[in-house]
Amino acid sequence: MNSAVEAQLAELGIEGYLKQHQYKSLLRFLTCGSVDDGKSTLIGRLLHDSKQIYEDQLAAVHSDSQRVGTTGEKPDLALLVDGLQAEREQGITIDVAYRYFSTQKRKFIIADTPGHEQYTRNMATGASTCDLAVILVDARKGILDQTRRHSFISNLLGLKHFVVAINKMDLVDYSQARFEEIRDEYLKFSENLTGDIDIQIIPISALEGDNVVDKGQNLNWFEGPSLLELLETVDVDYEKGAGEFRFPVQYVNRPNLDFRGFAGTVSSGSVKVGDAIKALPSGKTSTVARIVTFDGDIEEAQAGLAVTLTLNDEIDISRGDLIVLENAQVQTTNHLLADVVWMTEQPLQPGRDYDIKIAGKKTVGHVESIRHQYDINNLSTHGAAELPLNGIGLCEWSLNESVALDNYQDCADTGGFIIIDRLTNVTVGAGMVKESLTELERGLADVSAFELELNALVRKHFPHWEAKDLSQLLKK
């Protein structure tokens, strides 16, 4: 047992400790930045100085530091999170590593993301579930391309809180002038980022522990908070509950003939018993009869809560549909603009069909055109015929059916989607909806002869499937 937990158990008892832990707020954050900026070492220092490391873990770190460490005589705290053999041998981070810890004020989930350019897709994956980005900068090297790239991706993925931690201050003699030079350079770069972002810039030394958990004695000229103080006090809970009610249906819960509910997680906003709702894309309406949870019925469900909704009317709702309040204005379209992060060696090519998964909805779509590709270094744009590995571009998409969706900045769950290769079933990209475009009309010219023949065959030999006549539908 680690010493922090021991102290709290001694003070509160087991019941008091569990109760206090249950009601703490949760912050998900990632560490990102360029290669060797000290991301893994910073997380190791956070865990070590907040007394979250077990004695056997610390002993293993001391032992491994002699064999594969990179910090000389000192224990290499990066080994606490760099667990893959290849990571330890090369002294780098490859995969996203998750660590969990808590203080008396808050619970944390940390995503330690890789700094190398070829692992940008791993960084984007880690950032997609986070509330805050800790962007590491080496005080000797200053702002690098990968610093800009990770800042841009974090901004693209809707993160509203950035902590820019200027690390390795011990290697520049804790120079205030060097800190202010890098701070001003980053603030100038950040003017190109979109949205209302809260940016905090602090000096730290992850190796020595200065200004990570405790202030230390070497940065007396800095009057701001330590990194842990910032993480404990940043307000993200309000943002999670803000916004209009969105409830993507994950599955229809039918345990017996007397119960039919719709299970899922509230993506944003809240819903109460008695609220008038509508299901999209059908537009059918009803009212909420019950909100069912594992612990029994509740009167109101907030964002982040997994529940089953039952309705007062038997309306047709299936997996992938979206439940919203009756007066909500939600776009339903098969034509959209989205920023895409491409994650595979084979480039994204316009015209090729991919499986698209938005919330619980799965459909098929293709890129009509790539409007532009972003230059990560200066955030400018240029034309592109295809999108390469780790490329980020604005693409115009056409889907095979209309889907209810939001802009990603308004609701990540209903505005974000993954792109899946139809042959290999591998996730090849991630998309963030920027704008819904005018719905495209599909005619008979868009349907192949094979699809029409297959539709006729199904209706003839499998009438109980109740398949619609495709040729008649497309004439309407």
From Swiss-Prot:
> What EC number(s) are associated with this protein in UniProt?
2.7.7.4
SUPFAM superfamilies according to UniProt: EF-Tu/eEF-1alpha/eIF2-gamma C-terminal domain, P-loop containing nucleoside triphosphate hydrolases, Translation proteins
Top-rank taxon: Bacteria
> Does GTP-binding appear among the keywords?
yes
Tell me yes or no: is Chaperone among this UniProt entry's keywords. Answer: no
Q: Where is this region: G4?
A: 167-170
What GO biological process terms does the UniProt entry carry, in alphabetical order?
hydrogen sulfide biosynthetic process; sulfate assimilation
Q: Which InterPro entries match?
A: CysN_GTP-bd, CysN_II, CysN_NoDQ_III, G_TR_CS, GTP-eEF1A_C, P-loop_NTPase, Small_GTP-bd, SO4_adenylTrfase_lsu
A family per Pfam: GTP_EFTU
Q: In which pathway does it act?
A: Sulfur metabolism; hydrogen sulfide biosynthesis; sulfite from sulfate: step 1/3
List positions binding GTP: 33-40, 112-116, 167-170
The GO terms this record gives for MF are:
ATP binding; GTP binding; GTPase activity; sulfate adenylyltransferase (ATP) activity
Q: Region G2: start and end of each range? A: 91-95
What's in the keyword line of the UniProt record?
ATP-binding, GTP-binding, Nucleotide-binding, Nucleotidyltransferase, Transferase
Q: Which residues form a coiled coil?
A: none
Q: What class of enzyme is it?
A: transferase
Q: Which reaction does it catalyse?
A: sulfate + ATP + H(+) = adenosine 5'-phosphosulfate + diphosphate
Residue ranges occupied by any tr-type G domain in the UniProt entry: 24-239
Region G5: which residues?
205-207
Q: Identify the stretch(es) annotated as G1.
A: 33-40
Similarity comment: Belongs to the TRAFAC class translation factor GTPase superfamily. Classic translation factor GTPase family. CysN/NodQ subfamily.
Q: Which PANTHER family match?
A: TRANSLATION FACTOR
Q: How does it assemble?
A: Heterodimer composed of CysD, the smaller subunit, and CysN.
Job description of the protein: With CysD forms the ATP sulfurylase (ATPS) that catalyzes the adenylation of sulfate producing adenosine 5'-phosphosulfate (APS) and diphosphate, the first enzymatic step in sulfur assimilation pathway. APS synthesis involves the formation of a high-energy phosphoric-sulfuric acid anhydride bond driven by GTP hydrolysis by CysN coupled to ATP hydrolysis by CysD.
Q: What name has this protein been given in UniProt?
A: Sulfate adenylyltransferase subunit 1
The protein's organism comes out as: Vibrio parahaemolyticus serotype O3:K6 (strain RIMD 2210633)
